[in-house]
Amino acid sequence: MVRIAVAGAAGRMGRNLVKAAHHNPVAKVAAGSERPESSLVGVDLGELCGEGKFDVVVCDDLAKQIDQFDVIIDFTAPASTLNNLALCQQYGKSIVIGTTGFTEEQREQIDLVAQQVPVVMAPNYSVGVNLVFKLLEKAAKVMGDYCDIEIVEAHHRHKVDAPSGTAIGMGEAIAGAMGNKLSDVAVYAREGITGERTKDEIGFATIRAGDIVGEHTAMFADIGERVEITHKATDRMTFANGAVKAAVWLHEKPAGFYTMTDVLGLNDL
């Protein structure tokens, strides 16, 4: 049984992670945290999520429950995630990271810690999205040299970073398949007189509205035809179940940086 701690357990995603871990037959909800000022610190995690009493309460620092869990699942914010990453480094715990919006320096810090502890990090934990990443690599190799490539993503009004980590992951998959670095070809905003589109650029467009869980489309557009590869999520439990799957897979793995491609065994596709 893999003992799981959920960071940000009282948030929208946190509650789904608690539910997913509770219903996974080889996982156990063993700890959960919230900000110290939260009124939900001390509340039973099961009752918080409508799953009955777990006899595990929300704490304000996972260090206080360090002996209770094996793996942290963290979908919070960069600063909080890095704090939990340091905790894992100190105590030899594993971590599944779903947080997005890291700077390049923060990503380097994660890579460094992954030399000492097992880390799974992915922009999206949906099985479907990770299959899409593979499809995009193949499409880019076939069509990328002569098509205009655009990525459009839509999320709910509360999402604080843009473009989404998944959209960036799509761009990285496409750019990498074409032998490029995304930072060299990405165009994140267009306004005013921009001039004609350049050949190699990958454009991004962002929508924030209502309660959209997550929609992503990559477009390969030529003269006379275009191919669109789309993923639409309708329930956050898709991401939560994938993250718990990753946590179970990661348990007792050696130190290293892993992705959902590793978890799902997609490397040979």
Swiss-Prot record:
Pathway: Amino-acid biosynthesis; L-lysine biosynthesis via DAP pathway; (S)-tetrahydrodipicolinate from L-aspartate: step 4/4. InterPro entries: DapB_C, DapB_N, DapB_N_CS, DHDPR_bac, NAD(P)-bd_dom_sf. It is found in: Cytoplasm. Its main location: cytoplasm. The gene is dapB. It comes from the Bacteria. Its EC number is 1.17.1.8. It is an enzyme of class 1 (oxidoreductase). NAD(+) binds at G8, A9, A10, G11, R12, M13, E34, G98, T99, T100, A122, P123, N124, Y125. GO terms for biological process: diaminopimelate biosynthetic process; lysine biosynthetic process via diaminopimelate. Signal peptide: none annotated. The active site is at H155 (proton donor/acceptor), K159 (proton donor). It holds the Pfam family DapB_N. GO terms for molecular function: 4-hydroxy-tetrahydrodipicolinate reductase; NAD binding; NADP binding; oxidoreductase activity, acting on CH or CH2 groups, NAD or NADP as acceptor. NADP(+) binds at R35. PANTHER family: 4-HYDROXY-TETRAHYDRODIPICOLINATE REDUCTASE 1, CHLOROPLASTIC-RELATED, DIHYDRODIPICOLINATE REDUCTASE. This is 4-hydroxy-tetrahydrodipicolinate reductase. GO terms for cellular component: cytosol.
